Amino acid sequence: MRFMLLFSRQGKLRLQKWYLATSDKERKKMVRELMQVVLARKPKMCSFLEWRDLKVVYKRYASLYFCCAIEGQDNELITLELIHRYVELLDKYFGSVCELDIIFNFEKAYFILDEFLMGGDVQDTSKKSVLKAIEQADLLQEEDESPRSVLEEMGLA
């Protein structure tokens, strides 16, 4: 996978993850072009399309488009399943995810994506183990943020 984008029906980019080094200028150009192409397509059209030297796989969930660019030899159906699995993980974590969850908790959305995909390849297919890793990270963060007494800070309590 080259990159993954999440954007709204209004063309607002909500999340982007790039797995291949690309300049900012080129990224912006690619995002703009791809959003125009995907948003112009009718709902009944195929979720796969040829774009530049890549294949694009996208799926709309509510008001968000989840869009992945893959190499020519990669499987479109597996990529569609990866998108669906990511949405399932977001749903499990947020409880019926919506665009506002992504906007206000974008760091969690990126963290979930990073637990699921690494370098554009699937890291873990098990929803349970990905969610368990996220829960553990949340617990660590809560421990770090919880107030401690001076004695606890010094390791004396």
From Swiss-Prot:
GO molecular function terms listed in the Swiss-Prot or TrEMBL record = clathrin adaptor activity
List modified residues, type Phosphoserine.
S146
List this protein's GO terms for biological process: intracellular protein transport; vesicle-mediated transport
Q: Which N-terminal stretch is annotated as signal sequence? A: none
Q: Which SUPFAM superfamilies match?
A: SNARE-like (SSF64356)
Q: Which InterPro entries has this protein been placed in?
A: AP1_sigma, AP_complex_ssu, AP_mu_sigma_su, Clathrin_sm-chain_CS, Longin-like_dom_sf
An example GO CC term for this entry is: intracellular membrane-bounded organelle
Q: Does the keyword Transport apply?
A: yes
Q: Which Pfam families match?
A: Clat_adaptor_s
How the protein sits in the membrane?
Peripheral membrane protein
State its location(s): Golgi apparatus; Cytoplasmic vesicle membrane; Membrane, Clathrin-coated pit
Keywords assigned by UniProt? Coated pit, Cytoplasmic vesicle, Golgi apparatus, Membrane, Phosphoprotein, Protein transport, Transport
Q: Which PROSITE patterns match?
A: CLAT_ADAPTOR_S
Say if the entry is tagged with keyword Thylakoid: no
Subunit details: Adaptor protein complex 1 (AP-1) is a heterotetramer composed of two large adaptins (gamma-type subunit AP1G1 and beta-type subunit AP1B1), a medium adaptin (mu-type subunit AP1M1 or AP1M2) and a small adaptin (sigma-type subunit AP1S1 or AP1S2 or AP1S3).
Q: What role does this protein play?
A: Subunit of clathrin-associated adaptor protein complex 1 that plays a role in protein sorting in the late-Golgi/trans-Golgi network (TGN) and/or endosomes. The AP complexes mediate both the recruitment of clathrin to membranes and the recognition of sorting signals within the cytosolic tails of transmembrane cargo molecules.
What family, per the record?
Answer: Belongs to the adaptor complexes small subunit family.
The protein's name is AP-1 complex subunit sigma-1A
Name of encoding gene: AP1S1
